[in-house]
Amino acid sequence: MNSPASLSGESISESHGHVLVPGELDLSHGVALYLEDINVSFDGFKAINHLSLSIDAGELRCIIGPNGAGKTTMMDVITGKTRPDSGTAFFGQTMDLTRMREPEIAHAGIGRKFQKPTVFEQHSVFDNLELALKTNKGIWSSLFSRLSGEQSDRIDELLELIRLQDLRDRPAGLLAHGQKQWLEIGMLLAQEPKLLLLDEPVAGMTDAETERTAELFVSLAGKHSLVVVEHDMEFVNSIARKVTVLHEGSVLAEGGMSDVQNDPRVIEVYLGR
């Protein structure tokens, strides 16, 4: 299988060993993320073993698998935190993730949310979104620049999207757990990512919060590509058209939720039935 760059005949430019992020993400072939034959070892342990998968532009994909299956390491490779021993990782057609650093990958349009929410608890919901919106301008600009009308409108849109418009002035530290998760998702969205990586986003949520989160993710698909790592099978079933099952660092099965649930290999190693 040819990588996106070889298919398009394009490459990432370099300058003195420093990778230059292309100005525009190329999704012309309809693929947002492309991993092929990725391998990662830690002290002899094979965390990722010949892993290959692709995520279409605008797709909402759920990743499931037992502990130690390689889910976190896979996201570390995508975000540049971990360098693979071998393999290919492309964002769109031209961005070779294996040759980019973490800040470059984030700037290129890949946003990651960890399981535990990290918000500025002493600041209001609105201020958290404002800081996220200005983050690319540098710390001094973020602290002292005034919001433009367009930026204020964008924050209002985000507040409505994450359903926190009535709590805009509340300190983030006083929010419920689920509300903090939504706020952090809003902060990610403020940076206009094309690909969102979401690690167990509904862990610790109430049933009502989980349902709201499902609605949010479904509404984001299309404009954004989403990769959701989750253990809550009911939640996965409510949002996923396609599920990838990881086991021992490789793709064990892939398809619709019903197909995956009835796959004998998945039943044996993961679902326990």
Residue ranges and their predicted role:
Residues L7-R273:
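Glycine-rich phosphate-binding loops of nucleotide-dependent enzymes
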